[in-house]
Amino acid sequence: MTRLTSFFLFFFVSLMATTAMAEDKASKALALTPPMGWNTWNKFGCNVSEGLVKGAADAMVASGMKDAGYQYIVIDDCWQVKRDEKGNIVPYPDRFPNGIKAVADYVHSKGLKFGIYSDAGTKTCGGKPGGLGHEYQDAIDYAAWGVDYLKYDWCNTLPGQDARASYQNIRQALDAAGRPIVLSICEWGGRQPWLWGEEVGGNLWRTTEDIQDRWAGKKEWSPGHCCSNGMLDIVDENEPLYSHAGPGHWNDPDMLEVGNGGMTNAEYRTHFSLWAIMAAPLMAGNDIRSMNPDIREILINKEVIAVDQDALGQQGRRVWKDGDLEVWSKQLQDGGRAVVLLNRGASPQAVTATWEQVGYPGHVSAGVRDLWGHKDLGKFTGKFSAPVESHGVVVVTIKP
């Protein structure tokens, strides 16, 4: 090998390594707090359209959700009808008559960000064209359309297809397209993405099967096809993974069901509070165009949202449990703690959090603030107790 050849080989390898490092750094600079937004799937399934998405963008602004921190409008499955003769992905012309870019432009005009859905297999979960073999081609389209967020599913993959390699491939394709795009890994937790998702450039990864709009209990989607999860089942699967979350890489216990009608308002407050203390992405899944004031007030509670979005990026965890009663704690950037008192039971009960449980010396005097009541409760020493309604929570911050 000549010196000149050796030089060019060294230069090429160095350039590729530098590019890979730059792309890795770029992806990790995204989603430094858990993404907040709205997704079509939980409420509308495959019934997506330009009008629906534009209406949701309007509602996100008018309802106060944008001011509360929500920013992504995400079209989930079933927007794509086919690939053309060149292999380009094509949206349904009757549902999106002006194309996807026009929808993205409208979302951006509202000061929001735009997200879209695809799949690592040959077809999406809804049977539409998947991304396998078209990763770079699709990424170029996404960048040209103005996509800011990609949810990438795991249906209809090939026998033996490697999830880690597949998600690394789509991340590299997105980076090569030149637009910063948050990557949401959606393979339902079966291959433990919390162990490799950050390394391959994912910004969030699903940790469980799909959520269903109910308090608790697993349910088959169809005979032999397991399973969807009640809200508490999701919580119990996601909680032990707290050490794997942080700025730019989040455990995703699935989208919110708040407002879809399967739970009480108390249960929806619990749902929202537990997602917040787990530093989970807050992706609303209801019809935000027509939600009632009670649901709106749950979704735009800025004090609870601040717990979720705290810059320290620590996922909270369960620190005490006795039967149906639990205490959850999350360290905050200012040195305080966010604490959830949870009552899973059928009747009201008092729940107590001790300072030792949340990481403070027992003799310390600390101020306590009620985040759903929006009021300071005073100074307490050693512990804080409160009555908690059935299936409810009390959420407080504690700070010496």
Show where each model-derived region lies:
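Bacterial N-terminal signal peptides
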Residues: 6-17
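Structural recognition of the beta-strand scaffold that forms the well-ordered cores
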Residues: 34-40, 69-76, 113-118, 148-153, ...
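Catalytic cores of secreted or luminal carbohydrate-active enzymes
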Residues: 270-319
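Aromatic-lined carbohydrate-binding/catalytic grooves of carbohydrate-active enzymes
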Residues: 56, 60-159
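Glycan-recognition surfaces
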Residues: 134-137, 182-286
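Boundary at the C-terminal end of the N-terminal hydrophobic targeting segment
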Residues: 20-24
